[in-house]
Design a protein with these regions (language model features):
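Transmembrane-helix motifs of polytopic, lipid-linked glycan transferases
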Residues: 77-101, 143-146
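Membrane-interfacial loop-to-transmembrane alpha-helix junctions, especially the N-terminal start
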Residues: 6-8, 42-46, 100-110, 154-158, ...
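Membrane-interface micro-motifs in multi-pass membrane enzymes
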Residues: 47, 51, 103-149, 170-171, ...
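Start-transfer (signal-anchor) and selected internal transmembrane alpha helices
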Residues: 1-18
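Membrane-interface transmembrane helices that cradle and orient dolichyl/undecaprenyl
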Residues: 141-158, 192
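Juxtamembrane "helix-exit" motif on the non-cytosolic side of transmembrane helices
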Residues: 25-31, 61-65, 92-95, 116-127, ...
Length: 272
């Protein structure tokens, strides 16, 4: 049965990702920045905004004579494949904790790809140059979710989780949110009959996410301080006023989001 579950997850994930991003393989796409990046892929700009994995990947590509814009369709094929693998890892990791009807399992298979195939993710993917640099982040995200939910050795679980998360948010910081949502869901399912264990693991996951996020910010601050990179003007800050402003913005947005998906859906469809 596990073999068929895995196959179903793989096939459905493949169909969803190909439906969402297959068009990016058929022909080249260009963003506002693409033409500039043909001549200068700007690795250190990626470092300035905390995407150190992207920076390293671009530097390596430059040494190998690879251009992320010119070879965008090749990398898009790899990105779609790794996205399917990542989604399978996340889905299987959560499904192992589920003791529910088969219908719920298939709903999970359909739901998890929506974190990566939606209007917000598609907006990112229209920047064709992102295909190459998102590949390691995608794989690391899937591994981070699976190791927390499936690894039994505590020290190994948390060590690998930190490593995978550092790689993942070094590719794209928003991955931290996807990680937290799916891992907290998996923890609830795995230990729903053991509140103490559930809460301790939940706080552990939130703590790891916080530490890795702070690491990302501090690394950029240190490099800027020592003149190794320029200040992007878009960097995160530890100023209390800014943090409170961001929290208020997130809370205010919830009203619009749950009412009509910020204007995308009909009123009051989201709660349903």
């Amino acid at each position: 049965q596990n073999k068929y579950d895995f196959l179903a997850t793989f096939l459905i994930s493949s169909v969803v990702f190909l439906t969402g991003y297959g068009c990016m393989v058929i022909s080249d796409h260009y963003s506002v920045d693409s033409f500039n990046l043909v001549y200068d892929m700007g690795p250190y700009w990626q470092m300035q905004i905390g995407r150190y994995v992207n920076c390293g990947g671009i530097l390596l590509a430059e040494q190998m004579g690879i251009n992320q814009v010119i070879m965008q369709r090749f990398f898009m094929v790899i990105l779609i494949a790794t996205s399917v693998i990542m989604n399978v890892m996340i889905t299987v990791g959560i499904a192992k904790q589920m003791k529910v009807k088969r219908s719920s399992f298939y709903l999970l298979i359909l739901a998890t790809p929506l974190s990566f195939v939606n209007v917000f993710a598609m907006d990112l993917m229209l920047f064709s140059e992102m295909a190459m640099v998102l590949i390691p982040g995608n794989l690391a995200l899937g591994l981070a979710v699976q190791v927390v939910l499936c690894e039994e050795k505590e020290w190994k679980k948390w060590l690998l989780c930190v490593i995978y998360l550092i790689i993942s948010i070094g590719s794209y910081q928003s991955y931290i949110g996807i990680f937290e949502v799916y891992v907290l869901l998996g923890i609830y399912l795995k230990w729903k009959d053991s509140p103490k264990t559930r809460w301790s693991n939940s706080f552990g996951v939130l703590g790891v996410g916080g530490v890795v996020s702070i690491f990302n910010i501090v690394l950029v601050k240190i490099l800027v301080h020592f003149g190794m990179i320029a200040d992007s003007g878009r960097g995160a800050t530890f100023k209390i006023s800014k943090i409170l402003c961001n929290i208020k913005g997130v809370l205010d947005y919830q009203v619009s989001f749950w009412k009509n998906a910020d204007g995308i859906l009909m009123p009051y469809v989201m709660p349903v």
